[in-house]
């Protein structure tokens, strides 16, 4: 009995010394660790976010492949453990609980979407894990009590609220007479990622004198489910606004709006979506290259980004998966950047101690990724990220389309914006 009591006391001491976490080491590695560094992530390989989830998996795996080809991190190979959350906020919580409490992974990487990142990050916070992610930039992710208390979330990508501002600034640069007759509609899916940038754009465009067209069907965000997209799109088409600012999270949402607009023979002069058109070939193959022309989307990265590491990653991706450079999904770069930031933190701290990694990432140190510079503020947002607007445009020759940086104007790499969207090709996928 005495021996049993001693053993129990040691166990309690170990737990207390780690802050009482259910995973006492929180991924800490001793100085003699030589085994693989295991990184756990939950991704949407099925369900509504599956196109993004698969692209994120490809990005994580490409990063791990590159790291391991160069000897790993601190002489240790990287091993990924990825679970499928079926695009479910409930399942994502279960998955991270399993990765941390059962699999005892060293580190955790984030899922796709702010909707899943917010609850997932709270699981990581309770266990003392850093949560480096690339697709959870909504304010709701950083405003959680867990992040306010533990400051464990780090988003390597662009914060979402200001993403559409280059488009707003472009319209604001037009003569008052040119925008006086313009009207805009702001349909939004009920999603923490999709809504904030559209709500801010609406507020700013109204202040510029651009009239808001609305109806009961789009006065409030619609449920993020396929059965809701059609009625909302029909309501917009009936209003015939010159500008559509769509709060979307994925390709299917944008595709349905485009399909309904084509069926109703309504083509907005300008159409920008919060997400979807940034998905490369996943978008153009779904809607048709001709229908993609003129579609705009904000982002902090594109496949032809003038960054040596980005170019190398894009070349590798095309070699592995085929397709064209313009068709590389932005999610791949976001996921790859998560790995790059984690790698720099592991190397700088000399291991996988999550407390040390959190402290390092909050130190204000500038980090380098395929998306550009990363520097985290006190909430874990990337304050160094720049916002751009991209547009699909016809290639100079042939039937190909290119993903072109068009805003802000006057910035290096910015091309001319196509100010009027061509009419829909009703024989293409979006017109079907």
What are the roles of these predicted feature ranges?
Residues 99-112, 131-134, 183-188, 240-250, ...:
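Periplasmic-binding protein-like
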Residues 90-94, 139, 150-264, 304-312:
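Extracellular/periplasmic Venus flytrap/periplasmic-binding protein
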Residues 29-61, 83-90, 112-113, 187-196, ...:
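Extracytoplasmic "Venus flytrap"
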Residues 37, 365-432:
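Solvent-exposed, acidic/polar segments of extracytosolic/periplasmic ligand-binding ectodomains
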Residues 18-28, 51-56, 71-146, 156, ...:
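Beta-alpha junction/loop-to-helix N-cap segments that form part of ligand/metal-binding clefts
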Residues 150, 260-336, 413, 419-431:
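Extracellular/periplasmic periplasmic-binding protein-like sensory domains
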Residues 190, 250-256, 305-364:
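Extracellular/periplasmic ligand-binding modules, especially the Venus flytrap/periplasmic-binding
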Residues 11-15:
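C-terminal motif of bacterial Sec signal peptides marking the signal peptidase cleavage site
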């Amino acid at each position: 009995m005495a021996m049993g009591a001693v053993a129990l006391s040691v166990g309690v001491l170990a737990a207390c010394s780690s802050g009482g976490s259910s995973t006492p080491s929180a991924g800490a590695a001793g100085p003699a660790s030589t085994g693989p560094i295991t990184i756990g992530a939950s991704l949407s390989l099925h369900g509504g976010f599956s196109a993004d989830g698969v692209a994120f998996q490809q990005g994580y795996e490409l990063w791990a492949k590159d790291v391991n080809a160069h000897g790993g991190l601190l002489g240790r190979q990287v091993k990924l453990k990825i679970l499928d959350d079926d695009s479910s906020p409930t399942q994502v919580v279960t998955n991270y609980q399993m990765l941390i409490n059962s699999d005892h992974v060293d580190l955790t990487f984030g899922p796709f979407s702010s909707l899943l990142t917010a609850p997932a990050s709270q699981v990581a916070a309770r266990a003392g894990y850093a949560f480096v992610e690339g697709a959870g930039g909504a304010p709701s992710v950083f405003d959680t009590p867990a992040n306010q208390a533990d400051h464990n979330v780090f988003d390597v990508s662009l914060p979402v609220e200001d993403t559409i501002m280059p488009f707003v600034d472009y319209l604001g640069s037009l003569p008052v007479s040119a925008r006086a007759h313009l009207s805009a509609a702001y349909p939004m899916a009920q999603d923490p990622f999709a809504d904030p940038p559209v709500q801010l754009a609406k507020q700013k465009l109204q202040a510029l004198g651009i009239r808001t067209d609305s109806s009961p069907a789009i006065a409030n965000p619609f449920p993020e489910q396929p059965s809701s997209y059609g009625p909302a799109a029909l309501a917009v088409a009936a209003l015939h606004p010159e500008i559509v600012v769509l709060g979307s999270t994925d390709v299917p949402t944008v595709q349905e709006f485009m399909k309904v607009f084509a069926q109703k023979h309504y083509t907005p002069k300008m159409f920008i979506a919060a997400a979807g058109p940034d998905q490369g070939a996943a978008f153009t193959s779904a809607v048709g290259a001709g229908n993609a022309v003129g579609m705009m989307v904000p982002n902090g990265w594109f496949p032809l980004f003038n960054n040596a590491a980005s170019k190398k990653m894009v070349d590798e991706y095309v070699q592995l998966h085929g397709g064209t450079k313009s068709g590389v999904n932005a999610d791949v770069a976001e996921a790859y950047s998560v790995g790059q930031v984690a790698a720099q933190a592991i190397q700088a701290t000399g291991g996988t101690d999550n407390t040390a990694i959190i402290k390092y990432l909050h130190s204000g140190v500038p980090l380098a990724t395929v998306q550009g510079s990363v520097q985290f503020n006190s909430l874990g947002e990337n304050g160094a990220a720049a916002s751009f607007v991209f547009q699909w445009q016809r290639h100079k020759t042939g039937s190909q389309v290119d993903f072109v940086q068009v805003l802000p104007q006057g910035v290096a790499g910015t091309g001319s914006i196509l100010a009027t969207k061509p009419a829909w090709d009703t024989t293409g996928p979006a017109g079907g």
